[in-house]
Protein backbone atom coordinates (compact mmCIF):
# COMPACT_ATOMS: atom_id res chain seq x y z
CA UNK A 1 0.00 0.00 0.00
CA UNK A 2 1.08 3.56 -0.65
CA UNK A 3 1.03 4.58 3.00
CA UNK A 4 3.51 1.80 3.80
CA UNK A 5 6.08 3.30 1.43
CA UNK A 6 8.48 5.99 2.49
CA UNK A 7 7.17 9.15 0.90
CA UNK A 8 9.38 12.17 1.48
CA UNK A 9 7.57 15.43 2.11
CA UNK A 10 8.81 18.76 0.81
CA UNK A 11 10.75 21.16 3.01
CA UNK A 12 11.95 24.73 2.43
CA UNK A 13 14.99 23.66 0.40
CA UNK A 14 12.99 21.43 -1.92
CA UNK A 15 10.35 24.13 -2.45
CA UNK A 16 13.00 26.70 -3.39
CA UNK A 17 14.75 24.24 -5.69
CA UNK A 18 11.52 23.35 -7.49
CA UNK A 19 10.64 27.02 -7.89
CA UNK A 20 14.06 27.72 -9.39
CA UNK A 21 13.74 24.80 -11.82
CA UNK A 22 10.42 26.19 -13.02
CA UNK A 23 11.63 29.81 -12.97
CA UNK A 24 8.57 30.35 -10.81
CA UNK A 25 7.60 33.66 -9.29
CA UNK A 26 4.45 33.09 -7.21
CA UNK A 27 1.70 35.44 -8.32
CA UNK A 28 -1.03 37.16 -6.32
CA UNK A 29 -3.32 36.75 -9.33
CA UNK A 30 -3.33 32.98 -8.86
CA UNK A 31 -3.17 33.22 -5.08
CA UNK A 32 0.04 31.18 -4.95
CA UNK A 33 1.59 30.60 -1.52
CA UNK A 34 3.38 27.28 -1.13
CA UNK A 35 3.54 25.39 2.18
CA UNK A 36 7.09 24.30 2.99
CA UNK A 37 6.54 22.72 6.41
CA UNK A 38 5.93 18.92 6.57
CA UNK A 39 4.28 19.17 9.99
CA UNK A 40 1.69 21.59 8.64
CA UNK A 41 0.58 19.41 5.74
CA UNK A 42 0.40 16.39 8.04
CA UNK A 43 -1.72 18.48 10.41
CA UNK A 44 -4.10 19.27 7.55
CA UNK A 45 -4.39 15.62 6.55
CA UNK A 46 -5.04 14.59 10.15
CA UNK A 47 -7.69 17.29 10.62
CA UNK A 48 -9.41 16.02 7.48
CA UNK A 49 -9.44 12.42 8.79
CA UNK A 50 -8.00 11.23 5.48
CA UNK A 51 -7.60 7.47 5.14
CA UNK A 52 -6.74 4.98 2.41
CA UNK A 53 -10.47 4.70 1.66
CA UNK A 54 -10.72 8.33 0.53
CA UNK A 55 -10.83 9.70 -2.98
CA UNK A 56 -9.53 13.22 -2.39
CA UNK A 57 -9.77 16.17 -4.72
CA UNK A 58 -7.09 18.78 -4.12
CA UNK A 59 -7.49 22.23 -5.63
CA UNK A 60 -4.26 24.02 -6.48
CA UNK A 61 -1.63 21.39 -5.58
CA UNK A 62 1.13 23.82 -6.49
CA UNK A 63 4.52 22.21 -5.99
CA UNK A 64 3.06 19.14 -4.29
CA UNK A 65 3.49 19.67 -0.54
CA UNK A 66 -0.03 18.70 0.50
CA UNK A 67 -0.38 16.18 -2.32
CA UNK A 68 2.49 14.15 -0.89
CA UNK A 69 0.99 14.22 2.60
CA UNK A 70 -2.34 13.00 1.25
CA UNK A 71 -0.59 10.18 -0.60
CA UNK A 72 1.41 9.38 2.54
CA UNK A 73 -1.94 8.70 4.22
CA UNK A 74 -2.79 6.25 1.43
CA UNK A 75 -5.52 8.29 -0.23
CA UNK A 76 -6.33 8.39 -3.92
CA UNK A 77 -5.78 11.97 -5.10
CA UNK A 78 -7.05 13.92 -8.07
CA UNK A 79 -5.35 17.31 -8.22
CA UNK A 80 -6.89 20.21 -10.13
CA UNK A 81 -4.29 22.76 -11.23
CA UNK A 82 -4.74 25.88 -13.38
CA UNK A 83 -1.02 26.58 -13.96
CA UNK A 84 0.29 24.38 -16.82
CA UNK A 85 3.88 24.51 -15.55
CA UNK A 86 2.89 23.24 -12.12
CA UNK A 87 0.54 20.61 -13.56
CA UNK A 88 3.29 19.28 -15.82
CA UNK A 89 5.91 19.19 -13.06
CA UNK A 90 3.81 17.58 -10.32
CA UNK A 91 3.98 13.91 -11.50
CA UNK A 92 7.79 14.07 -11.71
CA UNK A 93 8.01 15.63 -8.25
CA UNK A 94 5.80 12.93 -6.75
CA UNK A 95 7.95 10.23 -8.33
CA UNK A 96 11.16 11.84 -7.07
CA UNK A 97 9.72 12.02 -3.55
CA UNK A 98 8.86 8.31 -3.42
CA UNK A 99 5.23 8.35 -4.57
CA UNK A 100 5.77 6.78 -7.99
CA UNK A 101 3.19 4.04 -7.40
CA UNK A 102 0.59 6.24 -5.75
CA UNK A 103 -2.93 6.60 -7.14
CA UNK A 104 -2.82 10.19 -8.33
CA UNK A 105 -3.79 12.19 -11.40
CA UNK A 106 -3.70 15.83 -12.43
CA UNK A 107 -6.50 17.69 -14.20
CA UNK A 108 -5.34 20.91 -15.87
CA UNK A 109 -8.28 23.25 -15.42
CA UNK A 110 -9.63 26.27 -13.62
CA UNK A 111 -11.24 24.99 -10.42
CA UNK A 112 -14.26 27.22 -11.05
CA UNK A 113 -14.92 25.26 -14.24
CA UNK A 114 -14.10 21.71 -13.15
CA UNK A 115 -17.07 19.35 -13.37
CA UNK A 116 -18.07 15.75 -12.83
CA UNK A 117 -17.44 15.08 -16.52
CA UNK A 118 -13.78 16.04 -16.12
CA UNK A 119 -13.34 13.21 -13.63
CA UNK A 120 -15.10 10.78 -15.95
CA UNK A 121 -12.92 11.88 -18.87
CA UNK A 122 -9.79 11.34 -16.76
CA UNK A 123 -10.99 7.96 -15.51
CA UNK A 124 -10.99 9.19 -11.93
CA UNK A 125 -13.36 8.24 -9.10
CA UNK A 126 -15.67 10.95 -7.84
CA UNK A 127 -14.20 12.64 -4.76
CA UNK A 128 -15.34 11.81 -1.26
CA UNK A 129 -13.29 14.60 0.30
CA UNK A 130 -12.00 18.04 -0.65
CA UNK A 131 -8.68 18.84 1.02
CA UNK A 132 -6.81 21.88 -0.21
CA UNK A 133 -4.79 24.99 0.42
CA UNK A 134 -7.21 27.10 -1.60
CA UNK A 135 -6.01 30.05 -3.70
CA UNK A 136 -6.76 32.92 -1.36
CA UNK A 137 -8.19 35.27 -3.97
CA UNK A 138 -11.00 32.88 -4.97
CA UNK A 139 -11.30 30.61 -1.95
CA UNK A 140 -15.01 31.02 -1.18
CA UNK A 141 -16.27 30.82 -4.80
CA UNK A 142 -14.14 27.70 -5.40
CA UNK A 143 -15.33 26.08 -2.17
CA UNK A 144 -19.00 26.67 -2.98
CA UNK A 145 -18.56 25.53 -6.59
CA UNK A 146 -16.99 22.25 -5.52
CA UNK A 147 -19.67 21.55 -2.92
CA UNK A 148 -22.41 22.17 -5.46
CA UNK A 149 -20.81 20.37 -8.41
CA UNK A 150 -19.75 17.28 -6.44
CA UNK A 151 -22.46 15.94 -4.09
CA UNK A 152 -20.12 12.99 -3.54
CA UNK A 153 -17.92 15.21 -1.35
CA UNK A 154 -19.01 14.49 2.20
CA UNK A 155 -16.07 16.10 3.99
CA UNK A 156 -14.07 19.29 3.43
CA UNK A 157 -10.88 20.57 5.03
CA UNK A 158 -9.54 23.74 3.44
CA UNK A 159 -6.92 26.30 4.35
CA UNK A 160 -7.95 29.89 3.69
CA UNK A 161 -7.07 33.35 4.97
CA UNK A 162 -7.78 33.59 8.69
CA UNK A 163 -10.49 36.22 8.31
CA UNK A 164 -12.20 34.10 5.64
CA UNK A 165 -12.05 31.08 7.93
CA UNK A 166 -13.67 33.11 10.69
CA UNK A 167 -16.42 34.31 8.36
CA UNK A 168 -17.16 30.84 7.04
CA UNK A 169 -17.55 29.43 10.55
CA UNK A 170 -19.24 32.49 12.11
CA UNK A 171 -22.45 32.05 14.08
CA UNK A 172 -25.62 34.11 13.55
CA UNK A 173 -25.56 37.36 15.47
CA UNK A 174 -21.82 37.94 15.21
CA UNK A 175 -20.39 40.93 13.35
CA UNK A 176 -18.56 38.72 10.86
CA UNK A 177 -21.52 36.46 10.10
CA UNK A 178 -22.59 36.98 6.52
CA UNK A 179 -23.13 35.54 3.06
CA UNK A 180 -20.21 33.02 3.17
CA UNK A 181 -21.45 31.74 6.55
CA UNK A 182 -24.98 31.16 5.25
CA UNK A 183 -23.94 29.57 1.97
CA UNK A 184 -21.35 27.22 3.47
CA UNK A 185 -23.84 26.31 6.19
CA UNK A 186 -26.35 25.28 3.54
CA UNK A 187 -24.18 22.28 2.68
CA UNK A 188 -23.07 21.10 6.09
CA UNK A 189 -21.83 21.85 9.57
CA UNK A 190 -18.93 24.32 9.47
CA UNK A 191 -16.20 24.66 12.10
CA UNK A 192 -12.78 26.20 12.53
CA UNK A 193 -10.18 23.44 12.81
CA UNK A 194 -6.92 25.33 13.48
CA UNK A 195 -4.88 28.47 12.88
CA UNK A 196 -1.79 28.23 10.66
CA UNK A 197 1.01 30.78 10.99
CA UNK A 198 2.23 32.67 7.95
CA UNK A 199 5.83 31.48 8.34
CA UNK A 200 5.09 28.01 6.96
CA UNK A 201 4.51 29.50 3.49
CA UNK A 202 6.73 30.68 0.68
CA UNK A 203 6.31 33.47 -0.02
CA UNK A 204 4.96 34.32 3.43
CA UNK A 205 1.53 35.99 3.24
CA UNK A 206 0.83 39.09 5.32
CA UNK A 207 -1.70 37.36 7.56
CA UNK A 208 -2.19 33.97 9.18
CA UNK A 209 -4.37 31.24 7.71
CA UNK A 210 -7.16 29.14 9.13
CA UNK A 211 -8.33 25.58 8.61
CA UNK A 212 -12.06 25.14 8.09
CA UNK A 213 -13.85 21.81 8.19
CA UNK A 214 -17.25 21.16 6.65
CA UNK A 215 -19.14 17.91 7.15
CA UNK A 216 -21.90 17.67 4.56
CA UNK A 217 -25.41 16.95 5.74
CA UNK A 218 -26.70 13.60 4.62
CA UNK A 219 -29.69 13.89 2.31
CA UNK A 220 -32.82 14.14 4.41
CA UNK A 221 -30.83 14.80 7.59
CA UNK A 222 -30.39 18.55 7.19
CA UNK A 223 -31.38 20.56 10.27
CA UNK A 224 -34.32 22.07 8.39
CA UNK A 225 -35.55 18.56 7.60
CA UNK A 226 -35.69 17.88 11.33
CA UNK A 227 -32.82 15.40 11.11
CA UNK A 228 -30.17 16.88 13.40
CA UNK A 229 -31.07 20.05 15.25
CA UNK A 230 -34.52 19.16 16.45
CA UNK A 231 -35.89 22.06 14.43
CA UNK A 232 -39.61 22.22 13.86
CA UNK A 233 -40.55 20.56 10.59
CA UNK A 234 -43.00 21.98 8.12
CA UNK A 235 -46.33 20.23 7.73
CA UNK A 236 -46.22 17.30 5.35
CA UNK A 237 -48.06 19.20 2.62
CA UNK A 238 -45.58 22.07 2.87
CA UNK A 239 -42.42 20.05 3.44
CA UNK A 240 -39.10 21.44 2.25
CA UNK A 241 -38.21 17.97 1.01
CA UNK A 242 -40.89 18.36 -1.68
CA UNK A 243 -39.15 21.40 -3.17
CA UNK A 244 -36.66 21.19 -6.04
CA UNK A 245 -33.20 21.15 -4.44
CA UNK A 246 -31.61 23.41 -7.04
CA UNK A 247 -34.40 25.97 -6.83
CA UNK A 248 -34.20 25.91 -3.04
CA UNK A 249 -30.44 26.49 -3.06
CA UNK A 250 -30.70 29.36 -5.52
CA UNK A 251 -33.47 30.99 -3.51
CA UNK A 252 -31.52 30.65 -0.25
CA UNK A 253 -28.42 32.17 -1.85
CA UNK A 254 -30.39 35.01 -3.46
CA UNK A 255 -32.06 35.83 -0.15
CA UNK A 256 -28.72 35.82 1.67
CA UNK A 257 -27.17 38.11 -0.94
CA UNK A 258 -30.06 40.55 -0.61
CA UNK A 259 -30.20 40.42 3.19
CA UNK A 260 -26.52 41.29 3.59
CA UNK A 261 -26.19 43.78 0.75
CA UNK A 262 -26.96 46.53 3.26
CA UNK A 263 -26.64 44.64 6.50
CA UNK A 264 -27.86 47.48 8.73
CA UNK A 265 -31.30 47.38 7.09
CA UNK A 266 -34.15 45.38 8.55
CA UNK A 267 -35.11 42.26 6.65
CA UNK A 268 -38.35 43.93 5.58
CA UNK A 269 -36.39 46.71 3.88
CA UNK A 270 -33.47 44.60 2.64
CA UNK A 271 -35.74 42.02 0.99
CA UNK A 272 -38.29 44.44 -0.45
CA UNK A 273 -36.61 44.31 -3.84
CA UNK A 274 -36.53 40.52 -3.84
CA UNK A 275 -40.22 40.17 -3.00
CA UNK A 276 -41.43 43.21 -4.94
CA UNK A 277 -42.36 45.41 -2.00
CA UNK A 278 -41.80 45.87 1.70
CA UNK A 279 -45.30 44.57 2.43
CA UNK A 280 -44.72 41.41 0.40
CA UNK A 281 -41.39 40.87 2.15
CA UNK A 282 -43.04 41.27 5.55
CA UNK A 283 -45.77 38.78 4.67
CA UNK A 284 -43.22 36.20 3.52
CA UNK A 285 -41.10 36.70 6.63
CA UNK A 286 -44.07 36.34 8.96
CA UNK A 287 -45.24 33.24 7.08
CA UNK A 288 -41.82 31.72 7.75
CA UNK A 289 -42.02 32.66 11.43
CA UNK A 290 -39.38 35.39 11.17
CA UNK A 291 -39.60 38.84 12.71
CA UNK A 292 -39.39 41.32 9.78
CA UNK A 293 -37.68 43.93 11.98
CA UNK A 294 -34.63 41.71 12.43
CA UNK A 295 -31.46 42.18 10.40
CA UNK A 296 -30.01 39.47 8.20
CA UNK A 297 -27.14 38.81 10.59
CA UNK A 298 -29.62 37.36 13.10
CA UNK A 299 -30.93 34.64 10.78
CA UNK A 300 -29.45 31.15 10.76
CA UNK A 301 -29.01 29.21 7.55
CA UNK A 302 -31.99 27.13 8.64
CA UNK A 303 -34.16 30.25 8.83
CA UNK A 304 -32.99 31.37 5.39
CA UNK A 305 -34.02 27.93 4.11
CA UNK A 306 -37.44 28.24 5.73
CA UNK A 307 -37.90 31.68 4.18
CA UNK A 308 -36.79 30.37 0.78
CA UNK A 309 -39.29 27.52 1.05
CA UNK A 310 -42.06 29.98 1.89
CA UNK A 311 -41.08 32.10 -1.10
CA UNK A 312 -41.00 29.16 -3.50
CA UNK A 313 -44.33 27.75 -2.32
CA UNK A 314 -45.99 31.13 -2.83
CA UNK A 315 -45.10 31.17 -6.53
CA UNK A 316 -46.03 27.59 -7.33
Swiss-Prot record:
Subcellular location, record wording: Cytoplasm
Cross-referenced NCBIfam families: ksgA
Gene3D superfamilies recorded: Ribosomal RNA adenine dimethylase-like, domain 2 (1.10.8.100), Vaccinia Virus protein VP39 (3.40.50.150)
Gene transcribed to yield this protein: rsmA
EC annotation from Swiss-Prot or TrEMBL: 2.1.1.182
A molecular-function term among this protein's GO annotations: RNA binding
PANTHER family (alphabetical): DIMETHYLADENOSINE TRANSFERASE, DIMETHYLADENOSINE TRANSFERASE-RELATED
Binding, S-adenosyl-L-methionine: 33, 35, 60, 81, 110, 133
UniProt-listed CDD domains: AdoMet_MTases
Family per record: Belongs to the class I-like SAM-binding methyltransferase superfamily. rRNA adenine N(6)-methyltransferase family. RsmA subfamily.
Keyword annotations from UniProtKB, A to Z: Cytoplasm, Methyltransferase, RNA-binding, rRNA processing, S-adenosyl-L-methionine, Transferase
Origin superkingdom: Bacteria
SMART domains documented for this protein: rADc
Entry protein name: Ribosomal RNA small subunit methyltransferase A
Catalysed reactions, as listed in the record: adenosine(1518)/adenosine(1519) in 16S rRNA + 4 S-adenosyl-L-methionine = N(6)-dimethyladenosine(1518)/N(6)-dimethyladenosine(1519) in 16S rRNA + 4 S-adenosyl-L-homocysteine + 4 H(+)
Gene Ontology cellular component annotations, sorted alphabetically: cytosol
Role played: Specifically dimethylates two adjacent adenosines (A1518 and A1519) in the loop of a conserved hairpin near the 3'-end of 16S rRNA in the 30S particle. May play a critical role in biogenesis of 30S subunits.
Glycoprotein recorded as keyword: no
Major subcellular location class: cytoplasm
Pfam families reported for this sequence: RrnaAD (PF00398)
